[in-house]
Curated annotation (Swiss-Prot):
Protein name (Swiss-Prot/TrEMBL): Small ribosomal subunit protein uS19
Top-level taxonomic group: Bacteria
Pfam family, one: Ribosomal_S19
Family the UniProt entry places it in: Belongs to the universal ribosomal protein uS19 family.
NCBIfam families assigned: rpsS_bact
Single GO biological process annotation from the record: ribosomal small subunit assembly
Function: Protein S19 forms a complex with S13 that binds strongly to the 16S ribosomal RNA.
Keywords: Ribonucleoprotein, Ribosomal protein, RNA-binding, rRNA-binding
InterPro entries for this protein: Ribosomal_uS19, Ribosomal_uS19_bac-type, Ribosomal_uS19_CS, Ribosomal_uS19_SF
Length: 91
């Protein structure tokens, strides 16, 4: 169920301060964050945000299509290594 419109989008305050500082300085360095639950706002477009996936920070270049989504959607947490091959092979 999506968040109520009267509440507005959720974003952690420490991330919002980092984003505003990066926009003000026109800084191109990635903004490092652990906040996967924060929503992508229009002022983040063009920034690179390094989102933590549990092991490392994954750089996410924010574009206009990502606005309204959560940061965690773009940094996968699980690695798929494929199914184990059958030793006997297919008959």
């Amino acid at each position: 169920m999506p968040r109520s419109l009267k509440k507005g989008p959720f974003i952690d305050l420490h991330l919002l301060k980092k984003v505003e500082a990066a926009v003000e300085k026109n800084d191109r360095k990635p903004v490092k964050t652990w906040s996967r639950r924060s929503m992508i706002l229009p002022q983040m477009v063009g920034l690179t945000i390094a989102v933590h996936n549990g092991r490392q920070h994954v750089p996410v270049l924010v574009n206009e299509d990502m606005v309204g989504h959560k940061l965690g959607e773009f940094a996968g947490t699980r690695t798929y290594r494929g199914h184990v091959a059958d030793k006997k092979g297919k008959r």
